[in-house]
Design a protein with these regions (language model features):
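Non-catalytic, conserved peripheral segments adjacent to functional cores
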Residues: 1-103, 110-113, 118-120, 125-133, ...
Length: 143
């Protein structure tokens, strides 16, 4: 059985595989949002070797937490109308090698990711206010 099957993951529109693991029971309407959101949500997110997370952004802060396998390059691309690469982080198991065990993607920031080894990478992502696909934007193809 593959890791995707064991973790009961499904394909994510940005690339990779995910499953929502928690949604806060408290809802509210944050300033600037088009409707009610959960206070926070959490997913497991797997990027197997050879796959990538395309440039995208969400309206809320997103905290990446390394869970297993190999390190991932997390690219931050600013908050402009299109991603502008320039700030790469590594989320992974080895702080001595400069890896971050946790990394914050600020609300509205473009982000993309890719595994740095053939092991792929597994992270948890916590979004607050909680994730809603209405708050998700993929960059135009080619970005």
């Amino acid at each position: 059985m593959s890791l995707v099957e064991r973790l009961r993951l499904q394909q994510h529109p940005e690339g990779g595989w995910f499953r929502e693991t928690w949604r806060a029971p408290v809802d509210f309407t944050p300033d600037g949002y088009p409707g009610t959101r959960s206070a926070a949500t959490s997913i497991l997110f797997l990027l197997p070797a050879g796959e990538r997370s395309r440039w995208h952004r969400v309206r809320s802060d997103e905290l990446w937490l390394w869970q297993g396998l190999g390190p991932l390059r997390l690219r931050l691309g600013g908050t402009g109308p299109a991603p502008e690469p320039g700030n790469d982080l590594v989320v992974g198991p080895d702080p001595g090698a400069g890896h971050l065990l946790q990394a914050l993607v600020p609300a509205g920031s473009w982000q993309a990711a890719e595994p740095l080894t053939d092991a792929g990478g597994l992270v948890g992502c916590v979004v607050a206010p909680g994730f809603d696909f209405a708050d998700f934007e993929l960059a135009p193809d080619g970005s």
